[in-house]
């Protein structure tokens, strides 16, 4: 109830992010960072040392604007690692998910390099946790084509050179297509059927299509497969043989590519602990960078934390109210509270 009334992550009436504290503070670049920042707001630190450690990180980022902005540039294309790992673990990740994951892994060495420039305790620990996962990057980069299909069953997934067997089947498939092209040209010349086309569908396989105007030129050895309104479809012994070669190679290739893709996915899944550690580190970096950006843009100051029971605020500004109205209209206020005479009592009851 208190969280809802404080409108920390959404407004009470509209249930919208705009108008909440999260709306003001969220300048994150990644989905993971956004979730981490939300958890910071919903579960604030209460230990003085932990608060100071977090402040140290935000201070370092604010004092190093060039590093911070470069860091945010590398965070921007980072995919939701936590989400994709769920898909990988559940074996629902498709080839495009792995390419998106690879593109994210490409950013990690740059992020780690920049974090190495900072010296606060939290960033030092973060640097150690952030594994650049270079082996997984190389695995995906060597195995999966640059622009794969979504489906894992229709081939076109595995890169040339990754599997000798897949390369051999791919060559057989390509040569088969060349043979079909040669057959079409040869039969056109032999029969004089200018509109002759070698076509394919999943029901009838490969066939020779002849428009009705050329039906009288069809050789007697051709076997009719289907009659259409404007054309006839035929097959020959040679075409049947080529179909067996091509479809046999295709079926084997698609099956092999699926197995190879599944193997790559399983190898990534086996590294879940490393990946989760890196995801958490990236999320923390993004959340801290967001808080630093907000602090810089709004000229926030770093509060001094004390355990003396004193709250002393000079020119305090409500972060949400200030953003909801014109800055010229907002009036800053001082606040002083302590455990002695300067106290506020909130009396509550059923009425």
Where on the chain are the PLM-derived regions?
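Alpha-helical coupling/stalk and coiled-coil linker elements that connect catalytic or binding modules
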Residues: 1-350
